């Protein structure tokens, strides 16, 4: 992925490819894409440990209505998305090596295949 690639466009492409993989019943691609998209989504999440002002009643200061619990997600740069995908690839490669040393060749090949699928988005 180059610095000119929009993270939102990349995620949209990955989601579209996930739909294609689901229709084709390609379990390896489904697994790789779901975890990569989830990793990006998790990185965009906001810190939930932000303290709220203390209140004396159960609902003091509470707001009600549609969307009151929503906050804007963090915006990731292309470099951050690249690092997230690179970490996904590195994790799969390391686990594939570990599985291979344990004699589980098929599992190692599956993880390497997932790493290749994610690498196509870099």
Where are these regions (language model features)?
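Charged, compositionally biased, marginally structured helical/coil segments
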Residues: 1-122
